[in-house]
């Protein structure tokens, strides 16, 4: 049994491999900031008679549905990530988000809009549960705190992206109102697809594998990581 896996992960110098992990997993905060901003920014468009013709109360209820879905998603997926693994869950939760936000763009009334907002929230809530564990287990302990702070700060990048997107897409001189709000939500799906392609190359957490008695698999994964890092940074220090 390879019991030095945690120490070997912690000794790794910061590398392109770590950047890939941070970008692929840390985008969750960007997506959340984007979604929270979008629903407020498109509210004016959603109450128009030529769009969904929602009331202000229904717009508020849809925002509540998103938050409720996020709480439920965090609880459900948080439990599952310990059972079935980090990688499987962070692929599933991103897929849930991707499909749900795309369906939001195709909503035909209040019920479908609120339902898909709840599912979008569930995907984001599940993302937080799966991603926090994966990031903490894949990054060296010495940089974990700073990395977490930097990643959390990207939430505001998502809000800025949402604000800028709606400023353009909700402009009737750019797109008609019935189409503009739908394209706004479709942006999240496009971003999700690109990130999903990157995440496919992020490995399962060797720490999780070790904890679940799969030490040989954890060792193989870690050797692959070490080989990539060594190719760029030279010999590694002793664990």
Indicate where each model-derived feature is located.
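Transmembrane-helix signature of 12-pass secondary carriers
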Residues: 1-239
């Amino acid at each position: 049994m390879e019991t030095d896996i945690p120490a070997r992960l912690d000794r790794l110098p910061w590398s392109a491999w770590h950047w890939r992990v941070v970008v692929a997993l840390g985008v969750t905060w960007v997506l959340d900031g984007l979604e929270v901003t979008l629903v407020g920014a498109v509210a004016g468009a959603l109450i128009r008679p030529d769009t969904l013709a929602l009331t202000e109360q229904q717009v508020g209820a849809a925002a509540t549905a998103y938050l409720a879905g996020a709480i439920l998603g965090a609880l459900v997926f948080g439990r599952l990530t310990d059972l079935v693994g980090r990688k499987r869950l962070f692929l599933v939760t991103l897929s849930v988000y991707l499909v749900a936000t795309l369906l939001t763009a195709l909503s035909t009334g209040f019920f479908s809009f609120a339902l898909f907002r709840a599912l979008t929230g569930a995907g984001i809530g599940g993302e937080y549960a799966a991603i926090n564990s994966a990031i903490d287990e894949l990054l060296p302990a010495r940089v974990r705190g700073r990395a977490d702070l930097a990643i959390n700060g990207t939430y505001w990048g998502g809000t800025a992206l949402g604000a800028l997107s709606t400023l353009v897409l909700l402009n009737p001189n750019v797109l008609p109102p019935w189409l503009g709000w739908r394209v706004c939500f479709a942006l999240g799906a496009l971003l999700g697809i690109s990130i999903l392609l990157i995440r496919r190359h992020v490995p399962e957490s060797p720490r999780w594998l070790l904890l679940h008695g799969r030490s040989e698999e954890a060792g193989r994964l870690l050797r692959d990581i070490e080989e990539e890092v060594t190719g760029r940074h030279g010999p590694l220090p002793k664990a």
